[in-house]
Each structure stands twice: as C-alpha cells, then as structure tokens.
Amino acid sequence: MRPERALARLQGLPLNFDEGAVPHHRWHVDQLSQALPGELPGEPARGGAWRIACRLVEDYRIADPAIVRATWEPGTPLEGRNMLLELRLYRVLRVHAGVRVTRAWDEPRRQDGRRARVFGFEYATLDGHIEMGRMDYEVWKWIDDGAVEFRLHAVSGASGQGPPWTRLGFRLFGRREQLRFYFRCCERIARLTARELGLPDDPPSPAVRVRKADPTQTPEPAANPLPRSSGA
C-alpha cells in the first residue's frame, strides 16, 4: 500500500492496547536523559538551546532516518496527529506502523524544589503496529542554572500483530533495535542542537539510563495503569 493511502487509513484506527492495561513481565519500561547545550539561568531564551530542541522534537528530527522515518499530514496540530512510521532494519526490511499523538504540553513544572519549563508530546501505537504501548519525548530547561536536557520515556511490548515474518523479526531483533533507536535519538538531538547553535560538532556526553524496569523488575500487575511519565 502506498504511504499516502496508509497514512489516510490511520484516521479511523483505534489504539492496539487497552489504556487501562497493566504492565507485566513482557513489557519494557525505559527512561533516558540526555544533556543538551545549556543557557543562562531564567526562562528559555529566544533562539536558545531549549527552543531549538523543542522544534527538533516537534518535527521528529530526533529519529535516526536509518532506523525510523515518519510521515504525517502537513499543518496538522501536534496533539491528535497521526504519524505513519517506517521501521527499518539494516536498510533491508521495512515495516509501516501507525501511532497517534495523544498528549502534548508546554508547561512550568517543579521537581525537588527546582523550577523547570517542559515541552513534550506522547504518542501511542495504533492497530496493526508490531509493538503496543506509548512513548513520550520531553525537553526540560531548569530555571535556576540554565541546564537543558532531553528525556525519553517508553512503555512497550510486542503486540503479536502483523505478518509472521515481522513478528519473528521483532522477536529476534526488536529489543536490540528498540534500544539502539532510543540512544540514537539522544545522540541526534544533542548533535543537532549544538550544530544549530554553531557549537563544535563534538561527540555529546552519553545518555543516562534513568530507568529500566524490564521483566523481572516490573512490579506485580495489581491495579497500576500502564505508567505515563510523571516528570520524575
């Protein structure tokens, strides 16, 4: 199916998981943090690192096109946007999958007594996606010292959907490619932000794995809903 038709089909598709579902031993929960070029203390500066990084996130330029490419209807608002993702494995296998932006925010927050400005969005997987779950991307600026960081939070599991060969490929390579995608997002946004600021194209500091709650670490699924990022 042509990408244009596949994108149009996403409009009527539901999510491929129950939003009231609970994580269990087959779900992965990941959270990464990546330091970005900083600013002076205070609210985000016009043309500064925070605003640049926010634009990169909104335009989905954080994704490495060798791993994931995205298409959406130009001019659509961020919240509610349907995105057709092309998942690539070593430039040989390609799978199309749909996601929908279910939330977007640009808000002040307070964490551990510190004030921050936070921009971000969350998308969730649609029917037919080889994975199920949700993922969010955020850009933080700390008001007290001007530090800027990118955060990525994901809760996902295999959906069991798609042709047999895609399910087999996901079982064999999915988790490895998933983590590679996460870390590449962190590296790309750091490099692209620095480049737009005219800074040297040096390798960024490595992303920090803030949270990992894989099978043996995931709490017993009592009554906890599928967790969303709380900004913690």
Identify the residue ranges that each predicted region occupies:
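A conserved amphipathic terminal alpha-helix motif
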Residues: T166-K212, Q217-P219
